C-alpha cells in the first residue's frame, strides 16, 4: 500500500513555492513547518513556508520545538494565530530537546491541554521511537486526542504500535529533508484545510519598531537567501527609520543599513513621516 508522504521543514530548508512543487513528483502531498521554539524563537522562514506549502499541497501544519513548560504553549499559540492558521490546522509538539526532563508525559499533556482548551483539537506529538520505548514519553498516558508522529530511521517499521505518522528518513531523495509516511492521511487536502491569511504590509515612510524576536537586514530585494542577508539584525523593541518600497506584491522597508520586512506581523509603525 502506498502511503501519503509529508515533509517537515525549518529555517534550514527553502521557503520557495518551486521547492514545494518540486517535491510533488516524488509523492509529497503535505508539509509540517517549524513555527517556533522555546519562548523567543520564531522561524524566519515560517510565513513563506506555510504560504507556499499550502499553495503547493492545499494543506499545511506547524510544529513547536519544545524545551518544557506551558508558557511555551502560549507562545506557540500566539504565533499560530499571527500566521492566520485556523482551528482545523494540525499542531505538533516536537519532543526531542536534550534539556528536557527524563519523564516528559505530564508536561506534554499540559501543553496539549492548553491548545485543546483554546479550540485547537488537531494535535500530535513528535518524538523518536527510542523515547517511547524507554518511557520518556509514556504512550499509554498521553492525552487521548494526541496523534503520534514517530521518528525511526534505517528500519522497516516505526518501532512502536498505533503510530499515525512515521518519519522514516532525514535524507529524502538525497536532500537534507525529513520525510514521513502519513498512515492515516491526517494531512490531506479535502477542501476544509486551513487557509493562511495573506500578509499585510506597511506602505508608509516613518519610524518603525520591531515586534517579533528578530529580523534580518538584506542587501537587496527580494528579502530571500542567506547570501543576501547582512550581518545586521534587529531585536524586539529596536527602532529604525524606513521608506516603504514595493517589489511585486510585497512591501519592504529601505533603511540606511539595508532592506527590512514591512510585514505587520513583525514590525509596528510608530510615527509616519511625510
Question: Model-found features: residue ranges?
Answer:
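Substrate-binding cleft of extracellular glycoside hydrolase catalytic domains
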Residues: 1-121, 145
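Functionally critical loop-and-helix segments that line ligand-binding/catalytic clefts
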Residues: 1-13, 18, 25, 29, ...
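Short beta-strand/turn micro-motifs composed of small residues
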Residues: 64, 127, 152
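Glycine-rich, charge-decorated loop segments at or immediately adjacent to ligand/cofactor-binding or catalytic sites
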Residues: 69-71, 75, 131-142
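Short Gly/Pro-enriched loop/turn and capping motifs at secondary-structure junctions
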Residues: 98-100, 130-133, 154-158, 170-173, ...
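Aromatic-lined carbohydrate-recognition surfaces of secreted/lumenal glycan-active proteins
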Residues: 120-133
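Beta-loop motif signature
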Residues: 196-252, 259-260, 265-274
